[in-house]
C-alpha cells in the first residue's frame, strides 16, 4: 500500500483528496494535516466522514511527515510548499503540490503575479507540470509535481489540439471562464458570503488573474512562440464547476469534420477527456463530482473565429482528481485507479 500524507486536508481540495483516496485500492491515508484543526477528529470537521475517518488531524510538519509516508499532497495556499521544500524531503518522498509554487518556471513572473517571494527556486527546473494528458512520461519519473490550476486545466485541454495544429492565430485567444464558489477556497471572506454570491455573477481579476501566466507559459511551450492571451474569470452562484468559452481567429477556413477529426485524434486515448458530439455544448452538471473534462467547439464562419468550450469539476480534475491521476502515474498504477467516478446528477 502507498502511504499518503495530506497537508491542508481540511480545505475543499484537501477534503476532496480524502474522498477520492478513501476509494483507492492501493492507498492508505496515514496523515491528515491541518494547521487549523490540530488534534481534532477529521469527522468532526467534515461530518460526511462520520464513521468513515476516525483519525485526528496533525500539524503541517512536512519534514516529520516525509519520514512516514511515500507521497505528500500539499493542498495549501501559495508559498507554503516553496517555503518548506528541501532536498532532504525529496530524497525521502514524492511531493504533489496543488498550489502554484512550481507551475511557473520563471521566478520573476511568479513573484510579479503572486506578490510573494519564491523561497525554493532551485526546484523549479525539476518540477514537472502535472497535466497528465501531455506530460505523462515525465510525470512517471518525477519526484516533484506542480499540479495545474483549475482554470488552466480546462482552458488548455479545450484549446490545445487547435493551437498545436496551428489552426488558430496565437495572438487572438480570448478565454471567458466561470467558476463555482469553492474555487475561492474555504477561508472566510466577505466576498464569498451567501448574500454576496447568491443570485449574482461577477467578473474578477480582470486582466490580472494569476492563472493567466500559467496558461500563457504552457501555450508558449506548445507553439514555441510567446503567446499572450486575454483571460477573464467570473464567479457564479454554484458550489463547484468550471465552464470555459474560448475564442480564436482561424488561420484558414476549416470544416466541422476537419476540426472534429483533430480533437478525436488528440483525445481518443484519453479516458478523462470527452469530445462531445456536434451541437452538444459542455455543461458543468454533466461532469460534477468526476474527473472528466467535456470539450466541444463551434465554427463561426461569419466572424472567421472558432469557439472552443470546456466543462469540468474544479475540485476534481481541477485539483484533487488530477493530483491522484499524477500519483497513479508516479507509482506505476493504472491511471484511472480510484478515479472512475460517475458524474453526479441531479
Swiss-Prot record:
Enzyme class: oxidoreductase
Protein family per UniProt: Belongs to the NAGSA dehydrogenase family. Type 1 subfamily.
Any Pfam family the entry gives: Semialdhyde_dh
Localization terms from the record: Cytoplasm
Organism from which the protein derives: Lachnoclostridium phytofermentans (strain ATCC 700394 / DSM 18823 / ISDg) (Clostridium phytofermentans)
Source taxonomy: Bacteria, Bacillati, Bacillota, Clostridia, Lachnospirales
Any Gene Ontology biological process: L-arginine biosynthetic process
InterPro entries in alphabetical order: AGPR_AS, AGPR_type-1, NAD(P)-bd_dom_sf, NAGSA_dehydrogenase, Semialdehyde_DH_NAD-bd
Keyword field: Amino-acid biosynthesis, Arginine biosynthesis, Cytoplasm, NADP, Oxidoreductase
Substrates-to-products reaction catalysed: N-acetyl-L-glutamate 5-semialdehyde + phosphate + NADP(+) = N-acetyl-L-glutamyl 5-phosphate + NADPH + H(+)
Name of this protein: N-acetyl-gamma-glutamyl-phosphate reductase
Annotated GO CC locations: cytoplasm
Superkingdom of origin organism: Bacteria
Active site location: 150
E.C. designation(s): 1.2.1.38
Role this protein plays: Catalyzes the NADPH-dependent reduction of N-acetyl-5-glutamyl phosphate to yield N-acetyl-L-glutamate 5-semialdehyde.
Amino acid at each position: 500500500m502507498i502511504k499518503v500524507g495530506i497537508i491542508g486536508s481540511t480545505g475543499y481540495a484537501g477534503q476532496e483528496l480524502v474522498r477520492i483516496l478513501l476509494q483507492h485500492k492501493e492507498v492508505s491515508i496515514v496523515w491528515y494535516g491541518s494547521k487549523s484543526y490540530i488534534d481534532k477528529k477529521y469527522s468532526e470537521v467534515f461530518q460526511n466522514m462520520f464513521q468513515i475517518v476516525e483519525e485526528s488531524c496533525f500539524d503541517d510538519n512536512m519534514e516529520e511527515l516525509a519520514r512516514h509516508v511515500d507521497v505528500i499532497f500539499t493542498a495549501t495556499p501559495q508559498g507554503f510548499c516553496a517555503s518548506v521544500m528541501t532536498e532532504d524531503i525529496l530524497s525521502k518522498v514524492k511531493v504533489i503540490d496543488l498550489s502554484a509554487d512550481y507551475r511557473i518556471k520563471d521566478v520573476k513572473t511568479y513573484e510579479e503575479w503572486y506578490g510573494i517571494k519564491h523561497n525554493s527556486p532551485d526546484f523549479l527546473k525539476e518540477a514537472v507540470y502535472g497535466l497528465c494528458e501531455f506530460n505523462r512520461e515525465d510525470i512517471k519519473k518525477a519526484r516533484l509535481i506542480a499540479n495545474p490550476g483549475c482554470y488552466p486545466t480546462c482552458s488548455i485541454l479545450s484549446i490545445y489540439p487547435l493551437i498545436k495544429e496551428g489552426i488558430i492565430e496565437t495572438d487572438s485567444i480570448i478565454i471567458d471562464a466561470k467558476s463555482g464558489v469553492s474555487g475561492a477556497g474555504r477561508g472566510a471572506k466577505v466576498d464569498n458570503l451567501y448574500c454576496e454570491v447568491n443570485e449574482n455573477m461577477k467578473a474578477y481579476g480582470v486582466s490580472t488573474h494569476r492563472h493567466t501566466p500559467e496558461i500563457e507559459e504552457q501555450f508558449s511551450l506548445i507553439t514555441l512562440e510567446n503567446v499572450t492571451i486575454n483571460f477573464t474569470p467570473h464567479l457564479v452562484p454554484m458550489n463547484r464547476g468550471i465552464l470555459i468559452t474560448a475564442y480564436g481567429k482561424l488561420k484558414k477556413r476549416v470544416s466541422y469534420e476537419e476540426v472534429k477529426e483533430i480533437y478525436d485524434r488528440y483525445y481518443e486515448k484519453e479516458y478523462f477527456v470527452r469530445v462531445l458530439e456536434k451541437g452538444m455544448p459542455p455543461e458543468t452538471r454533466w461532469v460534477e463530482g468526476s474527473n472528466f473534462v467535456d470539450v466541444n467547439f463551434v465554427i463561426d464562419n461569419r466572424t472567421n473565429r472558432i469557439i472552443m468550450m470546456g466543462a469540468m469539476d474544479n475540485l476534481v480534475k481541477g485539483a484533487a482528481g488530477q493530483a491522484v491521476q499524477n500519483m497513479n502515474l508516479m507509482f506505476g498504477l493504472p491511471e484511472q485507479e480510484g478515479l472512475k467516478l460517475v458524474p453526479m446528477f441531479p
